[in-house]
UniProtKB/Swiss-Prot annotation:
It comes from Cupriavidus taiwanensis (strain DSM 17343 / BCRC 17206 / CCUG 44338 / CIP 107171 / LMG 19424 / R1) (Ralstonia taiwanensis (strain LMG 19424)). Pfam families: FBPase, FBPase_C. Mg(2+) 2 binds at residues 123, 126, 290. This is Fructose-1,6-bisphosphatase class 1 2. GO terms for cellular component: cytosol.
Length: 364
């Protein structure tokens, strides 16, 4: 293997800190602890079935399976990953509290550990339903400032808009383990060297192309889509002979981290929009620890993130596990989808997947 001099994550954080002479080392320590948690999870994921961690937590049958606060069946690796984030991050003295997809209420830092000035919110293992079929999964995290002068953090402390994030990122556990991070000054990707146990800067200054020919959406929900989404997808599927004048490819991995990573690497647009499948839910993805961190990364990389109706990071949260519609990726495509929402297109637009260019079109 050729010798290449690369900056480690620690060196990168030190360089960033030098831009702010009055900054303490606490923030760097927090990010390094998050990275350590991701290394442990990467190792557990890599062992797969050999580690005995595949399958549902609580038992193999649905009747005995563990259910999280979202009403979703927990995988064994969900539980392990959540415990790893808590254990690795609680002791450092950098945090006032944590919140996770897997826990109903905020996690209080134990009294015998020092209390810090940051909050950490995370999805410990995004895409965990893909574990048993060996599809890439990941961890998503966001760092916020904690309110001053409170002993125990409450849910309210975490209800900050995405614009208040201090840092955000994800770890992708795939053929290689990558940590993709923003501290509010661009987006950088680090690859884990499994021999040295170090993250090295391999993808500096990631940028999302403004234009794309790829989109990602779960087409099985097409009958529930609102008119602007149906219009956008219909135009993409019409290809070169349609109003867009070019062909598009459609992707869907069912792992948000993997989708976001592909878009950061080569462009694209991801849509998990609000729909009518469950009118009580304004979306599927969680605002605080899924949508906002990815939105921060996209915006810092020159892309855009939106609900379709407003900038994603401008949404004022009203609950710890609030769900929301999410659209992100190449700026020009996201702006087009926003424009379709603003124009309130025809609600009776035909479903593109079951009419023109479809195997399901009724014969005349």
């Amino acid at each position: 293997m050729p010798e290449v001099q690369r900056m480690t994550l620690t060196q990168f954080l030190i360089e960033q800190r030098r831009r702010y002479p009055d900054a303490s080392g606490g923030f760097n320590g927090l990010i390094l602890n998050v990275a350590m948690a991701c290394k442990e999870i990467a190792r557990a994921v890599a062992f797969g079935a050999l580690g005995g961690l595949h399958g549902r937590a609580g038992g193999p049958d649905a009747a005995g399976a563990a259910i999280n606060v979202q009403g979703e069946v927990q995988q064994k690796l969900d539980v392990l990953s959540n415990d790893t984030f808590l254990r690795v991050n609680e002791w450092g003295g950098y945090l006032a509290g944590m919140a996770s997809e897997e826990m109903e209420a905020p996690y209080q830092i134990p009294a015998h550990y020092p209390r810090g000035k940051y909050l950490l919110v995370f999805d410990p293992l995004d895409g965990s339903s893909n574990i048993d079929v060996n599809v890439s999964v990941g961890s998503i995290f966001s760092v916020l400032r904690a309110p001053e002068g409170t002993a125990d953090v409450t849910e309210q402390a975490f209800l900050q808009p995405g614009t208040a994030q201090v840092a955000a990122g994800y770890a992708l556990y795939g053929p290689t383990t990558m940590l993709v991070l923003t501290v509010g000054n661009g987006v950088n990707g680090f690859t884990l060297d499994p021999n040295l146990g170090e993250f090295f800067l391999t993808h500096p200054d990631l940028r999302v192309p403004a234009d794309t020919r790829e989109f990602a959406i779960n087409a099985s929900n097409s009958r529930f889509w609102e008119a602007p989404i149906r219009q956008y997808v219909s135009e993409c599927l019409a290809g070169q002979t349609g109003p867009r004048g070019k062909d598009f490819n459609m992707r869907w991995i069912a792992s948000m981290v993997a989708e976001a990573h592909r878009i950061l690497m080569r462009g694209g647009v991801f849509m998990y929009p609000r729909d009518t499948k469950d009118p009580a839910r304004p979306g599927r993805l969680r605002l605080l620890y899924e949508a906002n961190p990815i939105a921060f990364l996209m915006e810092q990389a020159g892309g855009r993130a939106s609900t379709g109706r407003q900038a994603l990071m401008s949404v004022a949260p009203n609950a710890l596990h609030q769900r929301i519609g999410v659209i992100f990726g190449s700026r020009h495509e996201v702006e087009r989808i926003e424009r379709y929402h603003n124009e309130q297109t025809d609600p009776d637009l035909p479903n593109p997947l079951f009419n023109e260019r479809s195997l399901f079109r009724a014969s005349a």
